[in-house]
Amino acid sequence: MPRVKRGVTARARHKKVLALSKGFRGRRGNVFRIAKQAVMKAGQYAYRDRRAKKRVFRRLWIARINAAARELGLTYSQFANGLKKAAIEIDRKMLADIAVHDKAAFSSIVDQVKAKLAA
């Protein structure tokens, strides 16, 4: 078998890894063997946190809705129950946005919820 010279592919692979580790601190950004491990770990963190991000944002939206609802005399669980009874199908992301940016609209939603809870 003929000899295989891999200078071009090895350099390309090293350049790719070092490009991905650009901005890392110390030798993690400029030594291939260490950068390769750092890039792998960064990929693991990125994969994990893309999934965690969904949970984190849901918790944030619930906290914002809860705070806004409590200002108007309801807890989050009462508010969520009232939304279901009033057949208001707005997701948590939109409710949190309304609660933060449009107090009047959120107040009218809470009034509808209170009416359904009282009935």
Curated annotation (Swiss-Prot):
Record GO terms (molecular function) = rRNA binding; structural constituent of ribosome
Q: Does the keyword Ligase apply?
A: no
What the entry lists under Pfam families is as follows: Ribosomal_L20
Per its UniProt record, what PROSITE patterns does this chain match?
Answer: RIBOSOMAL_L20
Q: Name one GO biological process term.
A: translation
Q: Which UniProt keywords apply?
A: Ribonucleoprotein, Ribosomal protein, RNA-binding, rRNA-binding
Q: Which SUPFAM superfamilies does the entry mention?
A: Ribosomal protein L20
> Which family does this protein fall into?
Belongs to the bacterial ribosomal protein bL20 family.
Its biological function? Binds directly to 23S ribosomal RNA and is necessary for the in vitro assembly process of the 50S ribosomal subunit. It is not involved in the protein synthesizing functions of that subunit.
Family annotation (NCBIfam families): rplT_bact (TIGR01032)
- Protein name, entry field: Large ribosomal subunit protein bL20
